Amino acid sequence: MTNIRKSHPLMKIINNSLIDLPAPSNISSWWNFGSLLGICLALQILTGLFLAMHYTSDTATAFNSVTHICRDVNYGWVLRYLHANGASMFFICLYLHVGRGLYYGSYMHTETWNVGVILLFAVMATAFMGYVLPWGQMSFWGATVITNLLSAIPYIGKDLVEWIWGGFSVDKATLTRFFAFHFLLPFIISALVMVHLLFLHETGSNNPTGIPSDMDMIPFHPYYTIKDVLGLLLMIMILLTLVLFSPDMLGDPDNYMPANPLNTPPHIKPEWYFLFAYAILRSIPNKLGGVLALVLSILILIIIPLLHTSKQRSMTFRPLSQCLFWLLAADLLALTWIGGQPVEHPYIIIGQFASILYFSIIIILMPLTSLVENHLXKW
């Protein structure tokens, strides 16, 4: 008799994706983040579902309903802080996952990569709308500033913004629709994850050498299931430490004040995981130019496969490209820091320099360095 996991239509899919999947024998811990992202998504959907049972998406009661969750609901504070800090863990894993893809040339699987970029946009949109829901000061003003950016689009901008707002300012209609979309998007993300995995399993995983590993594969279970469990335990340990000891470390104190349209906070800034893009937006004096730079800072990932000029796929044996990669990583940290600073003298010029460097490394320096390395390899 055939094993049920190999014959049952549903079990067969799970078996071919998680158990008998052939995986390269040499993939490192940088390949753990895919599974961690899946677990983060499941955690966010689960905690979000329970939070939605107690939350009210009305401007008069939203802030109080979040307070009610924290004070009166059994373990409501755990749910709320798991959800808020879970988003931070999600983005840490997401950025490391993208960084891994850039370093090891995983973007050469273009379909998987492009679906991944769409996923990144979807997760960013979901996180932005989620930040608006507690209806604190930073929620309200963050929503006002970011949605207002669409008014920079010529001709249709103003109408587009009012259409998104559902009125002439960020108000009750905006909050209600943001809640609806914030609830819906994670399920769309789940479907996109399936597509992402479908494309990945068409080609198989890349590995640190960047060389095809068809001749040396091992089953996913038990080798990589055990490895993923270790990564999961480490992530949960970090997340629980954050939630139980310092839940507000990554948040903004202004969001503990109810939204007040008559009082603008001195420094409007998004959550830490958007600060690098926010810094790029602010570094361009022109509104439309800033919006374009903001969108391109993420959309540029789509053209990465076209900019690959090296004869080698991975950066493992390309020290010059490695230097540029880590310069890019440092530059993104600098942009994140700048995004959280006020718009005044030293920070403006640093932000502009870091923004120019960001685009220069990706569009000009990386492809040129790869060509130089190709030439050096001939010697």
Curated annotation (Swiss-Prot):
Compartments, record wording: Mitochondrion inner membrane
Cofactor(s) named in the record: heme b
One Gene Ontology term, aspect cellular component: respiratory chain complex III
Keywords, comma-separated and alphabetical: Electron transport, Heme, Iron, Membrane, Metal-binding, Mitochondrion, Mitochondrion inner membrane, Respiratory chain, Transmembrane, Transmembrane helix, Transport, Ubiquinone
Binding residue positions for heme b b562: H83, H182
Cofactor note: Binds 2 heme b groups non-covalently.
GO molecular function, one term: metal ion binding
Top-level taxon of the source organism: Eukaryota
Cited function: Component of the ubiquinol-cytochrome c reductase complex (complex III or cytochrome b-c1 complex) that is part of the mitochondrial respiratory chain. The b-c1 complex mediates electron transfer from ubiquinol to cytochrome c. Contributes to the generation of a proton gradient across the mitochondrial membrane that is then used for ATP synthesis.
Misc. comment: Heme 1 (or BL or b562) is low-potential and absorbs at about 562 nm, and heme 2 (or BH or b566) is high-potential and absorbs at about 566 nm.
Name this protein carries in UniProt: Cytochrome b
Organism from which the protein derives: Myotis capaccinii (Long-fingered bat)
